[in-house]
Every structure is written in structure tokens, then in C-alpha cells.
Amino acid sequence: MAKTETPTSDLVRTYLREIGRVPLLTHEEEVVLGKRVQQWMKLQELRQTLQSEEGDRDPSDLEWAAAAGLSIEELRQQQHLGEQAKRKMIEANLRLVVSVAKKYLKRNMDLLDLIQEGTIGMQRGVEKFDPTKGYRFSTYAYWWIRQAITRAIAEKARTIRLPIHITEKLNKIKKMQRQLSQQLGRTATLPELAAALDLTPAQVRDYLEKARHPLSLDLRVGDNQDTELGDLLETDCTTPEEFTLQASMRRDIDRLLDQLTEQQRQVIALRYGLEDGQVMTLASIGDRLQISRERVRQLEREALHTLRQARSQVQEYLAS
């Protein structure tokens, strides 16, 4: 019997086909687009500062431009370039969102919902990305995508333990948050969210507070209740910068080790615990590789000589 396709699987297939047509960005393109986004974000921050100084009154474009030292035309040009750059960076990396989302399937959420949450996380990553740091955007964005998805899973686990009428209201609030985020290109404020839902800001705040009661990290989630919530949320990297630095360092170390012969690489990995954190003696390595202790020493010496010559590739990590 032929397998019946569901509407959801059709939507996913169509979505994947569409995003697959968007070309990936080169590192040089990421730098150019990233700088445009950062210029636009600084103008946005300036606007928020002016707004708070004026008692939440929205500054006019003329006031905004004057505070930025720009003409109205220059301000609008910066806005156009910034929003266009942000859109390009998001669209070129949607395949990464799908890749991360697939790792969290069977966690009480559909793939499309996971993709949507991951995309919102990536939008935040685009806004925070500093292209002058030298790393690729995809490495940096991975942290933001994963954080958004795991938080969404935690929220879902939390809301299914609330009364149904509160859960329904929270679902509406979440849906409107997504819509406004896509329309505005940023996270909606509480008053904007309340107005769109025909609620008062106090009511929206109250519903959101109800969804924030503590959850045990031992809580089991997933279709088969086979994963603890803490397993999804725990990470050794507390910031996207730390995650990116570690990922970049691993990649550069792997590239460095690729300059060694297979046997040299094995010796270094075992001698310094690169595989499992357990260092081994020369004799133990010799037994493992079925070569003499002296041959192990020779391979180690040759490998270290090669690595010292190429250490400039990881010098920045050693300095930091």
C-alpha cells in the first residue's frame, strides 16, 4: 500500500524546495551584509533611546535623522539597506534552521513549529552578529537557533500542565508574537502585542507570568517520554560568542591535525586525550597500534615538530 502523504509533509517538502533555491553566502558577502545590519541596529537603538527620553513618545524621522547626524534620505537609505541585508542573511541560512530543527523532532512539537521557532532565533542572531570578529555567521547562528528551539520545547512542556483556557490564550499570544515579529522585523513590545490581541498590557503580562512557573529539569518530554528537559537545555557554552569560539577552535585544530600522517594523528590523539580526555603512555599507545614504544616516541616528535611550525593557525586561541 502506498504511503499517504499528510498536508504537513507536503508543506515541509514545498518549504524545503523553496529555500533550497536560495544560494549560500560567501564569507565576504556575510561581512558586507552583517555590517549593514549592524549600522541599522545602531540606528534602531538610537531611536529607542530618543523614545525613552521623550516619555515613550515616538520621535519623528526628522528628529531621529538629526540625532544620528544624517539627512532624511540617508536615514531611509540605511533602513532599506539594513532590512534588505537582514532578509538576505536569514533567507540564505534557512537550511541551517531546518538542519537544527530536525535534531529535535519527537519533542512534542511539529517540524514546521520547530522551524518557525528556529527562524525567530536566527533573526536574533542576525541582529547580534558582529562581522568584524572573523567567524562564519552559520557557526554563530547555530547557538541562537538551538536556544530558540529548546526554549520553545520547554515552554510547550510547561503550558501542557496549565488549565486549557490559559493554554489556548497563551497559544494565541505566541502566534501573534510570531506574526508581529515577521511584520516588524523585530520583537513586538508588550503594548503592541496587547493591542493586536485586543487585551490590556497587564492582561498579556499576567498570562505570560502564569506560563513561567518553574519546571523540573528531570521532566521527561517527547513522544516516548525518552528525553529529560535538562538534556535539551544544558550546554557548556553560556554565550553565542563562547560557542562560536569553541566551534572555530575545534575546526582549526582538526585542520591542523590534517597536516599529520594518519599514524601521527593517532599518536597525538591518544597521547594527549583528544578523543576521550584520557591520556596514554607511550607503551600503551604502542600496544594499541601494535608498534614499538620507540616508534611511538618518534611519531610524536615528528608530529609535534609539524604542529609547532603551523601553530600560527591556533595562536589567537592560545593568546586568549
From Swiss-Prot:
What keywords are annotated for this sequence in UniProt? Cytoplasm, DNA-binding, Sigma factor, Transcription, Transcription regulation
Q: Signal sequence span per UniProt?
A: none
Its BP terms in the Gene Ontology are:
DNA-templated transcription initiation
Q: Which GO CC terms are listed, alphabetically?
A: cytoplasm
Primary location group = cytoplasm
Map out region (Sigma-70 factor domain-2) in residue numbers: 89-159
- Region Sigma-70 factor domain-4: list its residue ranges: 256-310
Q: Does the keyword Cytoplasm apply?
A: yes
Domain of life according to the entry? Bacteria
Question: Which compartments does it reside in?
Answer: Cytoplasm
Q: Which residues bind DNA?
A: 282-301
Instruction: Name it.
Output: RNA polymerase sigma factor SigA3
- What organism is recorded for this protein? Synechococcus elongatus (strain ATCC 33912 / PCC 7942 / FACHB-805)
